[in-house]
């Protein structure tokens, strides 16, 4: 095996493959952000954490790199620009950000501020629409999706009166009548869109966004009925936008191509019917390579920005030329691809439970046969086939566990059973190799058994809920010591009192594994990990399991001289905030504390000290204090 190096660290944690050039390792082995992309200034995460700590921020800490948001947007726009130039497509492109992906002002507001021409916003609810009406640049595109009542429709039409290009996308046939009534009442011509329910279906965790069973969209007959009603009302020209959506993360570019071909047929047919289609909105689907495998895995993608853009532009360009149709403005709602890279959750390891090392205990008289068998297995490690011995050890362990449950082994003998088994397991692991096909199954099992548990100061349910909900994968990397070979393998568990509060799948060496190479924490130091690509959906979907609340947050912005500053800090939730949220009356809690202290009959000084400690607990951060390791 080659000696450890920075390049090997990059490969071990797959950094070049998932980072898209926004993260790398510096010469000191520190994880760095490159907010302006590959070749730009490198910001060392440990330095940023020190600056944040000096400003009173604590771990777990969400770091946002605002410049990455703008860079992602510009790269997306540039990819469509190149595709349109190559294919001689004159319709233009608008990148629309659906704020459901991350509604926080530091994200949606930052994109709106940097967006300029060729940028718009999408809302799927009344609260989102109210935010968008305030954020949107005059004259920009605003897409209104989702279920709509009369108030939602009226607010969207008011947006059009205020100079925004708001489009009400008809998701259900019943919406049209209300739109026509409200537009007449307000004296405004509506901008209408229709969501088509395509038969094409992408594979993956979000595939129910498309296909005949999709939650939203009109079937072919319903589309024809909509056109007939608009023609009858003399408003066919108001139907200006076609919308379809195949999923939030489409891994296979062929699925994108199939969906676009089907959507283009709708565009051609409706245009020939007299609809004034000027916009083609292909929705979301542009994925993020969380795995770094560039594959069809559900958390990966087998294409890049340029191929994605070309796949959408080409069939529409060809159809416009073949049918002599004016090319429509192309729109995507690629919120995940815009935001995922910009945010990193930094967490600290609170404790480590080492995997049992095993030992060979001193033989005892009248030892149970199962222990003698394990001793013989251990003694034969150098003389018999290694896999045969491993299977015998597994069988003996299972037998011994059953005997203990039946009362036929003592607790001491049960512990000796484990000692012998793990002594065998470590030696077997050292003699197996992944290059030998017959060894791989045993290696996988041993790698799961012989791992340390890293208990980490955060909540999976709050900070990365998709890990629990849909087995989402996020790359995880130590923020320092990457110039040092990791000597342990570990799995990560959070602070919650829930067995689901763990991470089961890790990005490693252009693949996925059930554990991750990690360092043993040093005495007197904090060991910190970065969880990357968490900028899309995770904050909004986070849950307050065990009353762990929002974490501290800091925005990191590049300065004109190539430096950076930590700005727009936001303190995370404190315990009193969380208790108030779930209905506790804080004054009643304080009164209950005081009553219990008084009833305990303590000395005045001790009683005052306890009241002070209770108040500090009530108003403190919901997460643990960062500690160094013993």
Task: Cite the ranges covered by each PLM segment.
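Charged, compositionally biased N-terminal leader segments and the immediate start
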Residues: 1-31
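Charged (often Lys/Glu-rich) extended helix/loop segments that serve as interaction or gating elements
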Residues: 4, 317-630
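Flexible, glycine/charged-enriched surface loops at secondary-structure junctions
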Residues: 59, 63, 85-90, 273-277, ...
């Amino acid at each position: 095996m080659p000696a450890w190096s920075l390049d090997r660290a990059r490969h071990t944690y797959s950094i070049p493959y998932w980072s898209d050039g926004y993260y790398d390792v510096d010469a000191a082995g520190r994880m760095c952000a490159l907010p302006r992309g590959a070749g730009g200034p490198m910001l060392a995460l440990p330095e940023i954490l020190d600056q944040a700590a000096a400003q009173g921020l604590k771990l777990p800490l969400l770091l946002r790199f605002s410049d990455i948001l703008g860079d992602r947007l510009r790269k997306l726009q540039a990819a469509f620009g190149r595709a349109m130039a190559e294919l001689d497509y004159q319709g233009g492109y608008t990148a629309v950000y659906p704020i459901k992906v991350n509604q926080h002002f530091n994200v949606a507001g930052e994109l709106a501020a940097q967006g300029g021409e060729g940028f718009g916003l999408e809302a799927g609810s009344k609260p989102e629409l109210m935010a968008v009406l305030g954020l949107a640049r005059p004259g920009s595109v605003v897409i209104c999706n989702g279920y709509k009542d009369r108030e939602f429709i009226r607010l969207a039409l008011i947006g059009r009166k205020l100079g925004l290009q708001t489009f009400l996308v008809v998701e259900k046939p019943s919406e049209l009548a209300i739109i026509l009534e409200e537009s007449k009442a307000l004296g405004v011509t509506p901008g209408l869109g229709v969501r088509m329910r395509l038969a094409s279906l992408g594979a993956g965790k979000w595939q129910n966004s498309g296909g005949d069973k999709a939650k939203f969209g009109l079937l072919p007959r319903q589309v024809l009925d909509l056109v007939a009603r608009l023609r009858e009302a003399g408003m066919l020209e108001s139907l200006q936008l076609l919308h379809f959506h195949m999923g939030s993360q489409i891994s296979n570019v062929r699925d994108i191509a199939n969906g676009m071909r089907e959507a283009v047929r709708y565009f051609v047919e409706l245009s020939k019917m007299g609809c004034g289609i000027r916009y083609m909105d292909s929705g979301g689907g542009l994925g993020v390579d969380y795995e770094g495998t560039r594959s069809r895995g559900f958390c990966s993608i087998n294409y890049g920005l340029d191929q994605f853009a070309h796949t959408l532009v080409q069939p529409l360009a060809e159809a416009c030329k073949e049918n002599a149709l004016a090319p429509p403005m192309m729109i995507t709602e690629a919120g995940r691809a815009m935001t995922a890279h910009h945010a990193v959750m930094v967490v600290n390891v609170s404790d480590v439970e080492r995997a049992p090392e095993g030992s060979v205990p001193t033989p005892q008289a009248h030892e149970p046969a199962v222990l003698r068998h394990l001793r013989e297995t251990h003694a034969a490690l150098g003389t018999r086939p290694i896999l045969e011995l491993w299977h015998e050890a597994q069988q003996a362990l299972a037998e011994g566990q059953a005997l203990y449950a039946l009362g036929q082994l003592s607790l001491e003998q049960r512990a000796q059973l484990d000692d012998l088994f793990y002594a065998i397991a470590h030696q077997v692991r050292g003699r197996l190799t992944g290059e030998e096909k017959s060894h791989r199954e045993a290696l996988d099992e041993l790698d799961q058994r012989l791992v340390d548990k890293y208990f980490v100061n955060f909540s999976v349910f709050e900070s990365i809920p998709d890990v629990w909900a849909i087995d989402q994968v996020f790359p995880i990397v130590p923020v320092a010591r990457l110039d040092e070979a990791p000597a342990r393998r570990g799995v990560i568990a959070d602070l919650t009192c829930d067995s689901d509060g763990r991470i089961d799948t890790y990005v490693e060496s252009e693949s996925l594994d059930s554990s991750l190479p990690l360092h043993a924490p040093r005495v007197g130091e904090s060991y910190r990990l970065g969880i990357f690509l968490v900028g899309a959906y995770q904050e909004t979907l986070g849950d307050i399991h065990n009353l762990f609340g929002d974490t501290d947050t800091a925005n990191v912005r590049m300065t004109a001289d190539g430096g950076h500053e930590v700005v727009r800090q936001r303190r995370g939730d404190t315990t009193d905030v969380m208790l108030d949220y779930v209905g506790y009356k804080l004054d009643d809690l304080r009164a209950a504390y005081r009553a219990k202290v008084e009833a305990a009959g303590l000395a005045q000084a001790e009683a005052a000290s306890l009241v002070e400690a209770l108040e500090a607990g009530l108003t403190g951060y919901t997460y643990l204090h960062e500690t160094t390791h013993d």
